[in-house]
Amino acid sequence: MASNNDSIKKTLGVVVGLSLVCSIIVSTAAVGLRDQQKANAVLDKQSKIVEVAGIDAEGKKVPELFAEYIEPRLVDFKTGDFVEKAEDGSTAANYDQRKAAKDPAESIKLTADEDKAKILRRANTGIVYLVKNGDDISKVIIPVHGNGLWSMMYAFVAVETDGNTVSGITYYEQGETPGLGGEVENPVWRAQFVGKKLFDENHKPAIKIVKGGAPEGSEHGVDGLSGATLTGNGVQGTFDFWLGDMGFGPFLAKVRDGGLN
């Protein structure tokens, strides 16, 4: 009988030991996978910034191009001025605007009238990306986001140094319907933005997503997405908010006045 008990104890010991080893392996793998996912997300974002900046990536790795041509800077949304650190002490190199927007100490809750992009909260500090060639700044890239039909849509908009002319746009995260709202990623649709003016003569946000098609030669109009009116409305709200006084409006006003020089 004692022999049977010893056998059972040994079996249980082996099972427990294997379980512990397996749990350690799984935990280690999960941590490694999470780190890899974070690294991939950073690389993807850098790739999109390099793309919308119009930088020729041939023959060089994205991190090298990003380090050479892109300078992240922090901006105080209220004043439009550059700042060295965010409220949590982060610098442009490690600032997480999404995380800040969720923290009541580092963000503001938007009223229904203010919240044209349907994002609920806005961080007090934003990040922009200066496109540089040596000491010269050729463009500025602003990150924008707004709610579509099914998802929050995140994009980068490249703006010339006049603070008004679009040189490119790319969506890097969205979950809209493939073939409909998901066409925000279509290069043909995105190409319509190039050369458009963000503001009218009174410096008010002027980009218009036009259902049925923008008039030919329109300075501000972009064709709506066929069969995706609500996604188009989300794109419209995104531009209305982020070009306005609660978004990058004050910063872009300073860019127009030569604030990058």
Swiss-Prot record:
It holds the Pfam family FMN_bind. One of its GO terms (molecular function) is oxidoreductase activity, acting on NAD(P)H, quinone or similar compound as acceptor. Keywords: Cell inner membrane, Cell membrane, Flavoprotein, FMN, Ion transport, Membrane, NAD, Phosphoprotein, Sodium, Sodium transport, Translocase, Transmembrane, Transmembrane helix, Transport, Ubiquinone. The modification FMN phosphoryl threonine is found at residue 229. Disulfide bonds: none annotated. The keyword Hydrolase does not apply. The keyword Phosphoprotein applies. It is an enzyme of class 7 (translocase). Its cofactor is FMN. It is a single-pass membrane protein. It is found in: Cell inner membrane. Its EC number is 7.2.1.1. The chain crosses the membrane at residues 12-32. Its main location: membrane. It catalyses: a ubiquinone + n Na(+)(in) + NADH + H(+) = a ubiquinol + n Na(+)(out) + NAD(+). One of its GO terms (cellular component) is plasma membrane. InterPro entries: FMN-bd (IPR007329), NqrC (IPR010204). GO terms for biological process: sodium ion transport. Belongs to the NqrC family. HAMAP family: NqrC. NQR complex catalyzes the reduction of ubiquinone-1 to ubiquinol by two successive reactions, coupled with the transport of Na(+) ions from the cytoplasm to the periplasm. NqrA to NqrE are probably involved in the second step, the conversion of ubisemiquinone to ubiquinol. Composed of six subunits; NqrA, NqrB, NqrC, NqrD, NqrE and NqrF. This is Na(+)-translocating NADH-quinone reductase subunit C. It comes from Vibrio campbellii (strain ATCC BAA-1116).
